[in-house]
C-alpha cells in the first residue's frame, strides 16, 4: 500500500470524528446495544432508528468516497460505467428505485428488504477487504474505508434486527439474501477485467447504501412519526 490519495489523516478523519461524536451522543459507540449480561435491556424504537439512520448515512458517505477515489485512480478512460449498469449481485432483490416506489411498499416488507440487502453484502465486503490488501499501489484510504464499511455494515444489520424485533415481536424473518459469486473476478490475472470487477462492486455498494439510507429515513418517518415529517 502507498500513501497517495486521501488518508485517515486527510478528508476521512473529520467525517470519522463527526460520526463518532454523533454515535457517542446517541450512545451507540458499540453493538450489541445492551451491555453484556444486561437483563430486560430495552432501547426505544426511536433511538434504534436514530442510530440506524446515522450509521446508514455514514456507510453511504464512505462508499461514495471510496468509489470516487477508485474511479479517479483506476477507471479513467476504461468505459467501466457503461458495463456496470444493472450488473449488481443484489439485482435479484426487487428494490424500489425511488421514494415514490418505496412509499408504496408496506413497512414490514421494506424492513425485511433492508435486512436482505445488508446480509447480501456480508460476504463481498469481507472479500473486498482481503483483496484490496493485495492490490499493488492501492492507497491506504481505500483499504481503511473498506474495513470501516465492513464493520459498520455488521453493526447496522444487528441494529436492524433489533428494530424488526420491536416492530414485529416474535416474528422470525427467514435469512434470505442474494448470494455473491464475484470473488474469482476480483482475482483475475487480466488487469482490465480485475479492475472492472472492483469498480462494479464499489459501484453497487454505493448504489445499495444509498437505497438503504433512503429507505431508513422513510421508515423512520412512517413508523416513529406516523408519517408526520
UniProtKB/Swiss-Prot annotation:
Localization terms from the record: Secreted
Residue ranges the record marks as coiled coil: none
Residue(s) carrying Phosphoserine: 56, 64, 120
Matching CDD domains: prolactin_like (cd10288)
Keywords linked to the UniProt accession: Disulfide bond, Hormone, Lactation, Phosphoprotein, Secreted, Signal
Pfam families xref list: Hormone_1
Keyword hit for Phosphoprotein: yes
GO molecular function: hormone activity; prolactin receptor binding
Superkingdom to which the source organism belongs: Eukaryota
Disulfide bonds: 34-41, 88-204, 221-229
Chief location bin: secreted
Function description: Prolactin acts primarily on the mammary gland by promoting lactation.
Family under the similarity heading: Belongs to the somatotropin/prolactin family.
PANTHER family: PROLACTIN (PTHR11417:SF5), SOMATOTROPIN,PROLACTIN (PTHR11417)
Subunit structure: Interacts with PRLR.
Protein name per UniProt: Prolactin
Organism: Neovison vison
Top-level taxonomy: Eukaryota, Metazoa, Chordata, Craniata, Vertebrata
Gene: PRL
